[in-house]
Amino acid sequence: MGLTAIGDTLIASGHPGRTTAPELGSPNLGIIRSDDSARSWSPVSLTGEKDFHALAAGPDESLYGLASDSIELLRSDDTGQTWSPAGEVVAVNLAIDAAGQLFAATPDGLQVSADEGATFTTVNDAPLLYLLAASPDSKRLVGVGNGGQIWVRPASGAEWVPAGTTHGSAQAITITNGGDILVFDQSGLTALPR
């Protein structure tokens, strides 16, 4: 399942649950959105067709997604209504920084694209991450490595620094504009103040 936000709008994808409204799609949700803090959802596009495992929104409201059925990176400039191919990358997670650079957590290490996903290069000296997220203002990045180490890039171009560890495997992580980290792992939701 992928989840991201564009302003106050939540954009998500995945598989329907037992209580999911039929109009949201099956066997895949495609792109769905919520404008009321996830109280209700409506279909946007690719209903029943795609399951995006990774979604990321940029500061310019561009949206990138990796579907579970291919390595093709897709891009949308209209909050997910239409999609076009951007490039290819084998990744488990995506994030976009304030400069518009697209980061991909790949099995071979962190990669970055400065050309809207057309090409990717390896980020030297970056940790190997399986979770990756950007702060709402896109100035900070946070990630989790295979050993449970939490890493933060506090500003564009800055070095990655360790910021703590998870309790077992983590399923989700985020960072606030102020630098506070929220991680959901085997012990539940934990806040790591900066």
Predicted features and spans:
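Short, solvent-exposed loop/turn segments at conserved positions within beta-propeller repeat blades
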Residues: T19-N28, L66-D69, A104-A105, N146
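Short coil/turn segments at the loop-to-beta-strand junctions that recur within blades
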Residues: M1, T47-F52, E88-N93, D125-L131, ...
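Blade-level signature of beta-propeller repeat domains, shared across WD40, Kelch, NHL, RCC1
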Residues: S169-R194
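Residue-level detector of Asp-centered blade-edge/turn motifs that repeat once per structural unit
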Residues: A5-D8, A57-D60, I96-A99, S135-S138, ...
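Residue position within the beta-strands of beta-propeller blades
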Residues: A12-G14, G65, A104, G143, ...
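Residue-level signature of beta-propeller blades and closely related beta-rich strand-turn architectures
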Residues: P16-R18, T47, D69, D108, ...
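Asp-box/BNR beta-propeller loop motif
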Residues: P27-S45, L74-P85, Q111-T122, G148-Q149, ...
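Blade-loop segments of beta-propeller domains
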Residues: M1-T19
